[in-house]
Design a protein with these regions (language model features):
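N-terminal segments that cap or nucleate solenoid repeat domains
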Residues: 2-47, 51-56, 61
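Ankyrin-repeat boundary/"N-cap" motif
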Residues: 4-12, 34-46, 66-79, 100-108, ...
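Ankyrin-repeat intra-repeat helix-capping/turn positions
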Residues: 18, 48-51, 81-82, 116, ...
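Ankyrin repeat domain, specifically the short helix-to-loop turn at the C-terminus of the second helix
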Residues: 24-31, 54-63, 88-97, 122-130, ...
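Coil-to-helix interface segments in alpha-helical RNA-associated scaffolds
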Residues: 49, 82-85, 119, 152-158
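A mid-sequence interfacial segment
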Residues: 87-89, 94, 99-111
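Ankyrin repeat (ANK) tandem arrays and their immediately adjacent linkers/low-complexity segments
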Residues: 102-107, 133-351
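Internal alpha-helical scaffold/solenoid segments in large eukaryotic proteins
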Residues: 103-139
């Protein structure tokens, strides 16, 4: 009787409740590399015991079987904190520690560092993995991880970074730049974060500041919503950044018209220039129309600039970089003419 090429649909639930002997009986009815689950990986991609994995390897299972998304069992488990034991077992059992996945060809070490699997990282080093191996984009595991690190990622990254740097992995300018960017984002959004997690996050950040030689990002000065707006920068590009940090909240709408002018001009620029309008909808159009209404309030731009602004808003979806820069410049100029805060009324947009 031919053996089935797919694992039972309830195999994942089975391995969490059944004994190894019962699992062997089920697998005995399947091809040794029968696949299943969302990724269509073989049995080694499931949370089996080390003894069960060893038995499967003795039966001839492919320890480096590639699932439909390009993951080997080791790569799959390396990307999950809950699967650290399985990943370590696979390394000990001879899985390919140089396997790569994804368009950027991230190695097992890249995945383990990014996931914060410290014990797996140590195991990989002991097995001879290169801690400075580069992805297709030319980034080492630490560089790649800091590149994409945000908020709570720093908590799990701190001990991994300390270990790798302790064994000689260099701290590059890329790492310092990425850390600075992540820290700035945290400080910008600090007010909106859960206070329960902040002590642990702050400890991780202080550790990384010292470890990487990065100057601490100062706490954000919150605008009170009533005082006259003070601008220190001279060029409009710098002024926009200064006003963004002062007036725009970490999430949601600004509390002043001036803040909404800066926020909307920035969101429009990002959606058009960075996203290619892929998220464009009626709400973006409503925001653009609101932006024009706002700059007609208080002390307006001169007549020629207002007409120019109206033209930019009318053709906003097809705007190029020059158009967006001009829209942003005029938005900043309007704020400089209206330094006394105006409260935002009812909004007809949600973004």
């Amino acid at each position: 009787m031919a053996k089935r090429k797919t694992l039972p649909k309830d195999f994942e639930q089975l391995v969490q409740t059944a004994s190894d002997e019962d699992i062997k009986k089920v697998l005995g009815k399947c091809d040794i590399n029968a696949y299943g689950g969302y990724n269509k990986g073989n049995a080694l991609e499931f949370p089996l015991s080390e003894e069960m994995m060893r038995w499967l390897i003795e039966q001839g299972i492919d320890i480096n079987y590639v699932d439909q998304y390009g993951y080997t069992p080791l790569l799959y488990h390396a990307g999950r904190m809950s699967s650290e034991k399985q990943a370590i077992a696979l390394v000990k059992l001879g899985a390919d520690i140089t396997a790569t996945q994804g368009l950027d060809r991230e190695t097992v070490m890249h995945v383990a560092v990014k996931t914060g699997n410290l014990e797996l990282v140590k195991c990989l080093i002991q097995a001879g993995a290169d801690a400075e191996v580069t992805s297709r984009s030319g980034e080492t595991p630490l560089e790649r991880t800091f590149h994409w690190a945000r908020t709570f990622d720093l908590i799990k990254l701190a001990p991994v970074a300390e270990y790798l740097i302790g064994i000689g992995v260099p701290v590059t300018d890329k790492i310092r730049t990425y850390m600075r960017s992540a820290a700035e984002d945290i400080e910008f959004r600090r007010k909106d974060m859960s206070p329960d997690i902040m002590p642990e996050l702050d400890r991780a950040m202080e550790s990384l500041y010292g470890l990487l030689g990065v100057a601490s990002v100062p706490r954000r000065v919150e605008y009170d919503g009533t005082s006259p707006i003070v601008i220190h920068e001279k060029r409009w590009q710098k002024q926009h950044g200064e006003l963004w940090n002062l007036l725009v909240p970490g999430s949601g709408h600004a509390g002043t018209v001036q803040g909404e002018v800066i926020r909307i001009s920035g969101k429009l620029a990002y959606e058009i220039l960075d996203n290619g309008c892929c998220n464009w909808d009626s709400d973006f159009k409503s925001m653009a129309n609101a932006l024009y209404r706002y700059i007609c309030m208080g002390t307006p731009l001169d007549a020629d600039e207002q007409r120019e602004f109206a033209g930019l808003i009318n053709g906003i979806k097809n705007a190029d970089e020059t158009d967006i820069n001009r829209l942003t410049e005029l938005s900043v100029k309007w704020v400089t003419l209206n330094l006394n805060p105006m409260a935002v009324g009812e909004l007809d947009y949600k973004r």
